[in-house]
Curated annotation (Swiss-Prot):
The keyword Zinc-finger is assigned to this record: no
Organism of derivation: Escherichia coli (strain K12)
Transmembrane domains' residue ranges: 6-32, 39-60, 69-93, 128-153, 181-205, 277-297, 392-419
Primary localization class, coarse: membrane
Compartments where located: Cell inner membrane
Gene behind the chain: trkG
Location of region: Selectivity filter part 4: 436-441
Single GO biological process annotation from the record: potassium ion transmembrane transport
Similarity remark: Belongs to the TrkH potassium transport family.
NCBIfam families, per database record: 2a38 (TIGR00933)
Protein's recorded name: Trk system potassium uptake protein TrkG
Cytoplasmic compartment residues: 1-5, 61-68, 154-180
Keyword Ion transport: yes
Stretches of the chain found on the membrane's Periplasmic side: 33-38, 119-127, 206-208, 228-237, 325-332, 420-421, 442-453
Length: 485
């Protein structure tokens, strides 16, 4: 990588750091309103990174070199690393929070990747500016995920949306958002914000206080899962709040391009036609029904309570939101394991959810069905069809290789944690929570991830970023072929 391209990457990263420093202004307003000392912490963070980012951006602006695909991969990974470090900075320098740098980094990575795992034991005791700040991290990270998945990664030839755009029927094929990245980002921002406002209003109507409604609204639509209370949604002990949280978890797992088309055209036909969405809703319904039956069968709740609690928690874990009821850790182990497995499914491509995504599972299901049919009729000329379109070998290879890498990293992280002395259930739940960007642990990490040692926390930070970027943009940087001229 020559000097000129280093300048290009530095220029872009400088601009992103400068832009992200502005995100410290809303928490400053909250701290000022509630007269909290954290105002100074956010101000210092703003000044430092405003100057660093602005300086890097300004001093490299005359590079005159065009961005290459290789530069794009580097910028994407640097985007999440830099944002994670900046997000951790105010949490680290505030002595009243008493967080080590590793703890602050874990919290920052968890927030900006919309994971929602926390190392803070008593979230409820945090100053309100930090409570808002954590939810804002989720919201900004969620927008970054959507823009990355829908607009950026397809330009680099990777990501689920590229697969969707080139081969699958649906919005990416026939209804491209806008021809320019900036316009696409703006369109997605408006759609995302409208859904967030709707969620806040519904929380407020369900009886949630305004501050809590704002924080939970923006963390719900981002599927981030940070809460203003240690008990999460369980703090409110309100069926309506759980219904709102579960409903918006599912709605936020829809492809955001679909939402844009629905809003702009004032028709729900795109939702009805989309085969990935139909498959996702079918799986979601199945998970909710199975979970409801399990908790009702053992007598934890009556039939009504079983459905409400299961609808909320199943929707939250399936979509990798991570909001929880207060007593979820007391649910039967087999039920929690079932929900942890469902978190690998995730939601639709082009949403804020984590996991492998429903379109990939749909293709794998169709491929498995195809193999069975081919074995039954060896001479028949059969093909894999999804929504009336033939799935090409290139797409099939892409799906299988992603599935293999995702499984490989999951098993690797589980074995490493288990080798550190954590029991298997804790290791599995912790890795599932992090690599799927779901955030809910079980076993030793049910209440907080602070029980992990520093090495384990760093590994889980890597898992969160790998899951958020869908693996390829990170591991490609370690390929010798990538760095050849």
């Amino acid at each position: 990588m020559n000097t000129s391209h280093v300048r290009v990457v530095t220029h872009m990263c400088g601009f992103l750091v400068w832009l992200y420093s502005l995100s410290m202004l809303p928490p400053m307003v909250v701290a000022l309103f509630y007269k909290e000392k954290s105002l100074f912490v956010f101000f210092i963070t703003f000044v430092i990174f405003f100057c660093i980012g602005g300086g890097a951006w300004y001093t490299t602006k005359k590079s005159g070199i065009q961005l290459r695909t290789r530069d794009g991969f580097i910028i994407i990974v640097m985007f999440w690393i830099l944002f994670s470090v900046i997000s951790a900075f105010p949490l680290w320098i505030d002595s009243e929070l008493n967080l080590t740098f590793i703890d602050a980094l874990f919290e920052g990575v968890s927030g900006i990747t919309t994971t929602g795992a926390t190392v803070i034991d008593d979230v409820s005791s945090l100053p309100r500016a930090y409570l808002y700040y954590r939810s804002q991290l989720n919201f900004i990270g969620g927008l970054g995920v959507i823009v990355l998945a829908v607009a950026v990664l397809p330009l680099l030839g990777i990501g689920g949306a590229k697969l969707y755009q080139s081969e699958m029927p649906g919005p990416f094929k026939d209804d491209k958002l806008t021809p320019r990245l900036a316009d696409t980002s703006r369109t997605l921002w408006i759609t995302y914000s409208l859904l967030g406002i709707a969620c806040i209003v519904c929380y407020r109507l369900a009886g949630m206080p305004l501050f809590d409604a704002i924080c939970h609204g923006i963390s719900t639509v981002s599927l981030g899962g940070f809460s203003t209370h240690s008990e999460s949604i369980g703090y409110f002990n309100n069926y309506l709040v759980e219904l709102v949280a579960g409903s918006f978890s599912l709605l936020s797992a829809f492809n955001f391009t679909l939402w844009y088309i629905v809003i702009s055209r004032k028709t729900i036909k795109p939702l009805i036609r989309d085969i990935e969405l139909r498959f996702f809703l079918l799986i979601a319904l199945g998970v909710i029904i199975v979970t409801s039956f399990q908790v009702w069968h053992i007598g934890m709740y009556d039939l009504h309570g079983s459905f409400i609690h299961s609808f909320f928690l199943a929707s939250s874990m399936l979509t990798d939101n991570g909001l929880a009821t207060q007593d979820y850790a007391s649910w039967p182990t087999h039920t929690i394991v079932f929900l942890l497995l469902s978190s690998f499914f995730g939601g639709c491509i082009g949403s804020t959810c984590g996991g492998i995504k429903s379109l990939r599972f749909l293709i794998l299901f169709k491929q498995s069905k195809h193999e069975i049919n081919q074995l039954s009729h060896p001479r028949a000329l059969l093909s894999v069809n999804v929504g009336g379109k033939i799935v090409t070998d290139r797409v099939m290879r892409s799906v299988w290789s992603f599935f293999f890498l995702y499984t490989l990293f999951t098993v690797f992280f589980i074995l490493v944690l288990n080798g550190m002395g954590y029991d298997f259930l804790t290791s599995f739940a912790t890795v599932a929570a992090c690599i799927n960007n779901m955030g809910l642990g079980f076993g030793a990490t049910a209440s907080s991830f602070g029980v992990l040692n520093d090495i384990a926390k760093c590994l889980m930070c890597i898992a969160m970023i790998l899951g958020r970027l869908e693996i390829y943009p990170v591991i490609i940087l370690f390929s010798g072929f990538f760095w050849r001229s």
